[in-house]
UniProtKB/Swiss-Prot annotation:
Name the UniProt record assigns to this protein: Beta/kappa-theraphotoxin-Gi1a
A GO cellular component entry from the record: extracellular region
Native source organism of the sequence: Grammostola iheringi (Argentinean black tarantula)
Disulfide bonds: 2-16, 9-21, 15-25
Organism ancestry: Eukaryota, Metazoa, Ecdysozoa, Arthropoda, Chelicerata
GO molecular function term, any single one: toxin activity
Note: Negative results: does not inhibit the potassium channels Shaker-IR (with inactivation domain removed) and the rat Kv2.1/KCNB1.
Tissue: Expressed by the venom gland.
Length: 29
């Protein structure tokens, strides 16, 4: 399952497409 609203992401729980966590992922990395 993918993450929808978490601020962190990893290979085990990747962000869902077009979700908030994906934006945070890019910002943090």
């Amino acid at each position: 399952s993918c993450q929808k609203w978490m601020w962190t992401c990893d290979q085990k729980r990747p962000c869902c497409e077009d979700m908030v966590c994906k934006l945070w992922c890019k910002i943090i990395k």
